[in-house]
């Protein structure tokens, strides 16, 4: 597939240099685009410094809920004595949806002696992984939008990334649609989307989707929406994966004159969510009946209750946090993994090397039913071509009914083999 390198990075054999963590200073100054939440519990062990980054306020995709969730998690952890006696110090950085921003955040993580980058989002894998690899800093629980997250020996993904969402979306649409038109960004990252969607369609004995490119930052998609509807035809589906501009696309789509044809709409979680369904009219809106593919259980699932309690108690009314957003959810799961790793290290000092060694040796992460049990040993990786670091190939099929996102199919669907 275009843009996805068919190899994995080879782990160097040199021993990692131990790094001494800087203690948190409550009055520390903040660099532009970055913040820090110091630990507050006064634990006897050294504090653990980590970073979470995501784009905020950019002209394309924005995920402010990820750093906001990281801060809330740290408040919760530190209020109860930290993680295994360690205060959790969270740095946040605005990646700005740019290659320069991604590189700046990674260099900031190195400078601040972060022991891991946790629960973050960036489309610029080469720019952020190079500095992290040079400093041997692990990348734990990234959103999964770049190839480096599934190739780098220092990446430990908690989901199957955009690849499994798109392959899963193809599987879901193959069950319900005679023909599919796909609207995706005209970017290098977007160039991979059709092949991934088509792999799922083929698994369901459907032909390839019609590939429709669109500007990632457009303010109107009327012409694109018209073409997509024409290509889908009656009995078909239009699926759009445009990040934050997915809402703009479907706003243009719903304004098209009714032509009497039965065409369903679709996307993947993170492009459409419960908040968007609510904003656009709920059961009487354009997303009623829409098919959606996600990584995790529906937001109403009881397994999310611990996260919701933390948000309610420690987010201090932070409007950036949406408990139904998969970015927020991914950050929660990534920090759950971090907690398990630190809990398995019986030492007063936590270093990047100790974290990676613990992950590589097979620490088990129980996410309470939000994912399968996660482990990152070599034998836990099925060796999917182009995505060798995937350990969780599961997705969920969801549908909008009566204005609510509900499970279309109970439980998880493993699409890892679809990518093979």
Which role does the model predict for each range below?
Residues 30-33:
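C-terminal motif of bacterial Sec signal peptides marking the signal peptidase cleavage site
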Residues 45, 62-68, 81-150, 216-219:
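Beta-alpha junction/loop-to-helix N-cap segments that form part of ligand/metal-binding clefts
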Residues 153-258:
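Extracellular/periplasmic Venus flytrap/periplasmic-binding protein
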Residues 36-73, 80, 93-100, 186-191, ...:
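Extracytoplasmic "Venus flytrap"
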Residues 94, 138, 147-172, 211-213, ...:
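Short beta-strand elements at the ligand-binding edges of bilobed clamshell
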Residues 109-122, 140-142, 180-184, 212, ...:
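Periplasmic-binding protein-like
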Residues 253-333, 412-416:
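Extracellular/periplasmic periplasmic-binding protein-like sensory domains
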Residues 318-328, 339-404:
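Segments of small-molecule ligand-sensing domains
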